Amino acid sequence: MRVLHLASEVFPFSRSGGLGDVLGALPAVQARLGEDAEVTVLSPWYASLQGEPQELWRGEAWGEQAWLGELRQDGVRYLFLGLNEFQRPGLYHPDDVERFCAFGRAALPALDAVGVTPDVLHGHDWQAGLVVAHARLRGLRTAFSVHNLQYQGRWNLHEAAGWTGLPDWTFGPDGVEFFGDLNLMKAGLNFAGHVTTVSPTYAQEITTPQYGEGLEGLLVRLTHEGRLSGILNGLDQDRWNPRTDPDIAAYSDPAGKAGAVKALRQEFGLDDAPILATVSRLADQKGMDLLITALPELVRDWNVVVLGGGDPLLEAALTGWANHPRVAFASGMNEPLAHRIYAGAHAFAMPSRFEPCGLSQLIAMRYGTLPIVRETGGLADTVPPEVGFRFADATAPAFLQACREAQAAFQDPAQWQTRATRAMSLDFSWDGPARQYLELYRGL
């Protein structure tokens, strides 16, 4: 079975978040587990791409100059589609709908040029939605994964219709139209043979008005047709392994964390209070405003360490706290520092308003750091109550109550050790999800 993944980013070649992490792990595990699986990944050839693909082809695709490059790693063939639209710094820009329409038009003709004919095409998030539509119109078997429904790839349809290369009949509510806009997420949902989300709970949540982002009616229909399901993301357990992590003093059990905790205290000048940390985009979705609102009470019992960037108002608020002796804030993203935080913290805060799956809580538990999470999406599916601390309402008081429960547990070393040992023993490898996807493909 020839499987083709399409995504806007893939670790380690291009990455801005969890989507890149998934595409950096899932295809390699599928290639290892699937005896008959040939796995290829197609992604844009960004000017900032980390790596040097070997050029395979250069020509025209849908009337536009295009080129394809190749890298092979871990049994996976990585193809990179070059277009003029992607020859600028960074990954994402305000005109991304137009850019990924160009990608969506050119992808299949470029693959034709090098003889890539997949049995199953698996698109990821709205940037791949147009490719899924074109593939379905060709009669290919297709799957589409929603990693975050909030981002949909919308643009005025009157202006954008000509960017798509789709026939006119697709520009209605049963196709790609959404309140007068082109909606590339909706293209993926409507044209895929099967749609997955990245956790079972999120698959249920997005059929409701609270989480459906205006697409809940379509998602309810897909559920009734048996075309929507949730498959949990896994974790790259080689990349995130406290036993072999080069960025920390390695350890294999909760007692071994002491060196990492001491190092983090020294790095940020923290006192002996337990460390509550988060590594996150600073965004409304992540509930960082709840954490900031809770800081006056949190610092009575906790040191608080935050690594992240995003919303300027949230960054400014955290910067304003940075002189407090129990608060440390590092702006931006820094992977070696992230490793040190996951290892050196005692607890990890994720007060998300919604969380399709979440990887941070999986990493935290892998490192024996106990999550404090809101019961939503993948957080509800992955953090057992006997390991972490959960709360239901997206409010600062509810979050604080969960933090108090964690603080009380921390005062009982035996209980904390038991929870941390359980956390480190949980299996969130990609093997199970990879098998589920392969089984899904066979049923398309």
Curated annotation (Swiss-Prot):
Catalytic activity: [(1->4)-alpha-D-glucosyl](n) + ADP-alpha-D-glucose = [(1->4)-alpha-D-glucosyl](n+1) + ADP + H(+)
A Pfam family: Glyco_trans_1_4
Classification via InterPro entries: GS/SS, Starch_synth_cat_dom
GO BP term, example: glycogen biosynthetic process
A GO term, aspect molecular function: alpha-1,4-glucan glucosyltransferase (ADP-glucose donor) activity
Keyword Metal-binding among UniProt keywords: no
Pathway: Glycan biosynthesis; glycogen biosynthesis
UniProt binding sites for ADP-alpha-D-glucose: R15
Designated name of the protein: Glycogen synthase
Species in which this protein is naturally found: Deinococcus radiodurans (strain ATCC 13939 / DSM 20539 / JCM 16871 / CCUG 27074 / LMG 4051 / NBRC 15346 / NCIMB 9279 / VKM B-1422 / R1)
Gene that encodes it: glgA
